[in-house]
Amino acid sequence: VEIFSLHAPGLSEYDVDRLPFSIKILLENLLRHEDGRKVTTADIVALAQWSLNPLAHGEAAGDAAKEISFSPERVLMQDLTGVPAVVDLAAMRDAIVELGGDASLINPLVPVELVTDHSVIVERSGSSESYEQNVAIEYQRNLERYELLRWAQNSYDRFRVVPPGMGICHQVNVEHLARVVFETDGVAYPDTVVGTDSHTTMINGLGVLGWGVGGIEAEAAMLGQPTSMLIPPVVGLKLVGATREGVTATDVVLTITELLRNHGVVSKFVEAYGEGVGALSLETRATIGNMSPEYGATCAIFPIDQVTLDYLEFTGRPQSQLELVEAYAKAQGLWHEPTAEEPIFSEYVELDLSTVVPSMAGPSRPQDRVDLPGVHRAFRAELGREPKDAIGVDAGASLRDGAVVVAAITSCTNTSNPSVLVAAGLVAQRAVERGLTTKPWVKTSLAPGSRVVMDYLDRAGLTQPLDQLGFYLVGYGCTTCIGNSGPLFDGISDSVIANDLSVTSVLSGNRNFEGRIHPDIKQNYLASPPLVVAYAIAGTVDIDLTIEPLGIDRDGVPVMLADLWPSDLEVAEAVRASVTPEMFTERYSAAFEGDKHWQAIDVAQGETFAWNAASTYVRRPPFLENLSPEPSIIEDILDARILAKLGNSVTTDHISPAGNIRGNVPAGEYLIDGGVTPVDFNSYGTRRGNHEVMMRGTFANVRLRNELAPGTEGGRTLKLPEDLEMSIYDAAMRYAIEETPLIIFGGKEYGSGSSRDWAAKGTKLLGVRAVIVES
């Protein structure tokens, strides 16, 4: 096997050995793709002497900031962002055929894996039938999208689809898809990935360099185009010591999120090193990598070591792959030796793991970590008044400010880690033994990121106690973490709105922005799975679980959290006895086959997609219609009108929302005209394959304020010169009839966020020729 050696004679004059591992991976990537055009010798030299660059010493780079072309080896997609990418590729095939070309020329040139995980919604919960009911609803709503994916699965080369119900893309990536090291045509090289989801960084825990990109960048990578990037600064995160008894991986990652947010790591790589690295399980490393977007880093990579190899073996990777990974990592200086000389980093941050304490984060930002005893104080500080009650929940029970109305064990961030899930099961088991139940207003759910989770919970005898507390399986997907929490229990929303209550959610997710989990929930707290169970029993966050009982047992004895919390040894022994390599091998042997619903989908044949003119989910986009072989000429913008004048921090979600569609907005009116009932509107995210919905949804976020229409929210503007107030979409269509070009003005931080492609496409479809902002 050949390699592009980082110790080649041409690099001997540079201190390559002390480069950060992440920079070494980038350097190998440039060496392998050098062509004198996209990647030049000057690019390679600039990266090889990274330690001499001002960036390496935490200084402003100035002219030293150099752009390079990085070529990822594969692309990972989820369905909300993946479906519009497939739509674009299908439209490219149509366009090339119309120009007299061969449709088969439009094919991915690198492996692409799309995991269908973002569409399942917790419509049903609290019963053994919840899972099947939610799956049936998911397929009924999303059949048109899934028909497209089935066609793509059969039509494209190097394109694989993991059907619904297998898990969350990042967890599936860590447990099965990631190679760590590739071998192709006798050449070995590092596995690198870009993904259409910001939490693609979870794979960093496995020593794989990767991060999230927009859909358009992912499409370019699929078609063999490199990703342009500035040579990054790298922050060294030195880990020392080991966690104390009772501290979970969630506590560690919330502490790191707070630490790195305060330090400042935006647009920087983070790389873990130090003797504490070896004390962390692979799953904990993956959890830390996963939350890179929350602390602002491009990625947060861990080096390859024996822990990596043990995990690869445990999850069913073949012995030959393990040997390749070890040999390659050691040959290229990518193997972590705690006693080796430290790499050179741009900046240094240190965390003593023994200082981490049980934590949560909230009420509205992942970096707002709170020690467990302080959660009730954080709630009251945000509330800003004395808590009040509202009567009328389940036979007279009292709903109060601080009530936990959603308690969700969810998200790839935590459900990839057997230790915290087993701990949750043990807490549930002890609670049931004491006769405790969850409060009647708490909507409980369990949505693992992998089918393996239910296998080992079953084997450990922990599924039943979780069920008894209402944590029934509701789906294998993102669910509550991305806002797919479904409706609250009957009467809860009405009571919350009528009494202006500040109710809460507790979830094992990664984001807790206001309004994200459910529009009627004002405060959201991130917590480990065992704490999710505890708060479901307590029913409120207005409590100090370290000194107050979370319930009274059947004998009238107060039950403290400490009475239910398992020891680290108990958790470790339960994990060791219940999680087996065979579970991973068996579950992933059919990763791409799908269930009976998937198999029953009628698969279209042919190299071009048969568009359904009646579809409200998938439409041929207009971007590639009537193309000419030559690029069009860019014309001057004359006699333009301002469509919107926006303020600061207008995110991609303000520009192109992903959430619910209301009936009284242009997108809702379009769907109603198409025969769709409001209950089946689904979300903007699931409608990203239909440009008609998406252009109507552009600038339609309910919280968007346009200074042209003061006093309004939700995508309103003034049509000029008539000064008529109307929706931004309706105004844009009137301007289009008048052939008037449009301009958007904005303040600072315009367009921050993820899912950038429709924020750009939708704006263009409205006839906007330029966006002028401060930053």
Pin down the residues of each PLM region.
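Active-site-proximal structural scaffolding
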Residues: 20, 85, 107, 170, ...
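Terminal amphipathic helices with adjacent charged low-complexity linkers/tails
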Residues: 70-71, 76, 85-145, 271-272, ...
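Generic hydrophobic/aromatic pocket-lining and core-packing "Φ" positions
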Residues: 289, 463, 759-760
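Cytosolic catalytic domains that perform sulfur/thiol-centered chemistry
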Residues: 1, 359-361, 367, 484-775
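Acidic/polar, glycine-rich intrinsically disordered N-terminal extensions of enzymes
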Residues: 1-71, 598, 605-606, 617
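Mobile "lid/hinge" segments at catalytic clefts and subdomain interfaces of large enzymes
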Residues: 163-165, 178-337, 352, 420-422, ...
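Long, structured ligand/cofactor-binding scaffold of large enzymes
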Residues: 35-239, 249-254, 358-361, 375, ...
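Structured core elements
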Residues: 2, 76, 86, 113-115, ...
